[in-house]
Amino acid sequence: MEPNKSILQIMKSNSDKVKIILGNIITMLGNRIYIDNNGDSKPLLDPTNAFKNMEERGDNVFIIKADNGDLYAVKVIFQKITAISKQSVISEFLDEYETYKKIIVTKDYTGKIDTFILRNSGQIFKEHEFLADLLSNEFQPRFQLLSPSEMESVKTEYNANPYTLKKIVRSDPIVRYFALKKNDIIRIIRPSATSGQGIDYRVVV
């Protein structure tokens, strides 16, 4: 898959890539959920409405409003980030959008950068991760996010806990895609030759 990504990166202009990246970020956010006042899980946003109402702030910064009222500030940087100084583009972005949830997309970055962004209510991704939607891959199983009450039901039904459930690590692309937290449980549905579909669960560690 890497050669295809490289070809796409070469063939597309930066402005074209920004459009693709934003479309896939909005798709990702649309696949996330929030819990409403009744305790029910709802899609974080409607992708069509979110794209139509997205606000451009200049310098590849875009604001996306979620249906639960959260505001997401998205910053696309076409370079590798190796350090963050007080006067850096990243620091200025984090300071200006301190009260927002933040998504940064860059060519590459170090592990220390990832940790720093997480501590500032943000996520950072590599450019190639948003040149296609992760869940649109035909070989991906289906994933279902669970509400807190659904997680408790799984624990009760299967007599499960974080020690007995199968694990998925926080660095996994799926965990990052859904912004899952430690001890969250996700349902995985795969095709099965015997039962039509197989259902499994993973807990984030």
Curated annotation (Swiss-Prot):
GO terms for cellular component: DNA-directed RNA polymerase complex; virion component. Keywords: DNA-directed RNA polymerase, Nucleotidyltransferase, Transcription, Transferase, Virion. GO terms for molecular function: DNA binding; DNA-directed RNA polymerase activity. It comes from the Viruses. Transmembrane segments: none annotated. Its EC number is 2.7.7.6. Gene3D superfamilies: RPB5-like RNA polymerase subunit. It is found in: Virion. It catalyses: RNA(n) + a ribonucleoside 5'-triphosphate = RNA(n+1) + diphosphate. GO terms for biological process: transcription by RNA polymerase II; transcription elongation by RNA polymerase I; tRNA transcription by RNA polymerase III. It is an enzyme of class 2 (transferase). PANTHER family: DNA-DIRECTED RNA POLYMERASES I, II, AND III SUBUNIT RPABC1. Belongs to the archaeal Rpo5/eukaryotic RPB5 RNA polymerase subunit family. DNA-dependent RNA polymerase catalyzes the transcription of DNA into RNA using the four ribonucleoside triphosphates as substrates. This is DNA-directed RNA polymerase subunit 5. It comes from Acanthamoeba polyphaga mimivirus.
